Amino acid sequence: MLQTKKYQFWFCTGSQDLYGDECLAKVAEHSHKIVDALNASGVLPYEVVWKPTLITNELIRRTFNEANLDDTCAGVITWMHTFSPAKSWILGLQVYRKPLLHFHTQFNEELPYDTIDMDFMNENQSAHGDREYGHIVTRMRMERKVVVGHWSDPVVQGKIASWMRTAVGVVESSHIRVMRVADNMRNVAVTEGDKVEAQIKFGWEVDAYPVNEIAESVNAVSASDVNALVDEYYEKYNILLEGRDPEEFKKHVAVQAQIELGFERFLEEKNYQAIVTHFGDLGALKQLPGLAIQRLMEKGYGFGAEGDWKVAAMVRLMKIMTAGKKDAKGTSMLEDYTYNLIKGKEGILEAHMLEICPTIADGPISIKCQPLSMGDREDPARLVFTSKEGHGIATSLIDMGNRFRLIINDVNCKKVEKPMPKLPTATNFWTPEPDLYTGAEAWILAGGAHHTAFTYDLTAEQMGDWAAMMGIEAVYIDKDTKIRDLKRDLMLGEVFYR
């Protein structure tokens, strides 16, 4: 399972010295208890670290500077226990460069009706202080997440946990490096994009390598290593010979084992976390990487087909954001292939020639070797399966020429009515929200690609928050989408995102 760095989030409480030492001691005590409770909840994927109460301009600026410089800090959570004059926060906020969450909570859950007095009112002013602080953040046009509710509420804790995963995605984005083993498929538009702008906006480094350079790494893998991995395949997966000679079949599988090991070693040596290939540029490779790529995705690598580096980076990003999640259902590249248009049963059959991540599989996973008309190579081995049912999101990051746009569609995955015995690929089948017809029309109007980065384990809100923190446009297609409203939003986006 993919593991990320043990990130922390700093909990910074605002106040001022106007209230005196006794009050400030209670502020510190309360914020300590909140941090301890959040960490003990079992809901948060990362640790919250208490920081001393911030009461002066210089302390605030120093704390935010330290957060910038601490590689383990993925973001700051702020809360105003008392009133904290917001001009004190300007210098700190100006220098801050990481994700920010404004936690609008208070220590007590219920009004102490019988005992409340002005001392209590002065000490517990979150409703007052958080508005002052919120004003200056808005005036400074800073992107931040606001979570409202009592700190003991599991729903509120879940919102913080959700934001943490997005924040880690923002921080980790600048560490994503994509290896292009092949260029973009000839004459295809949507998989193109400005790689320099992607590095400016997202921090992604996208580099090209000759396919035969990585093929040398593949050829250097020893026979003993290949045989050991093939044995692992045969133990883990069903083997569907379908009339093929067992020894001949195994040789095809061994080619993919050699590719997996060679690719992984090359990626590790060069420090890349995502890869793209193209069936039109295979060089000395004996097969189009299929099973090998599926296994690499399962280990956490991003992948994009036909040179689609944006999808490769997004798949890697989403795997990072979901790393370590309990009961995760999976993340993969997918492609819109063909429709079922029977009334009441509408949906899109999602697949690709070979490369669908087995993390989304439901039930048995099998190895098949079938001819592939594209690539002019040996019959490639691949994993075949059907995917889990349930809700997910399909995302498409596109280059609009003057900016990037992230399209996010809520989809509902289901089983197809009948087996498809002649289809030698892994598949998913979903109906986009609000329905196939509106969803497909909206997707096309927004400019969405035929390749998607798909996951069961993130929400549209999380990916929209990521887009907002990255300063790019997000277009949502969900149960509430109306085409007239979507067209208006797209026109407004043209004006705002210049």
Residue ranges and their predicted role:
Residues 60-73, 90-92, 260-269:
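Short, well-structured alpha-helical segments in soluble
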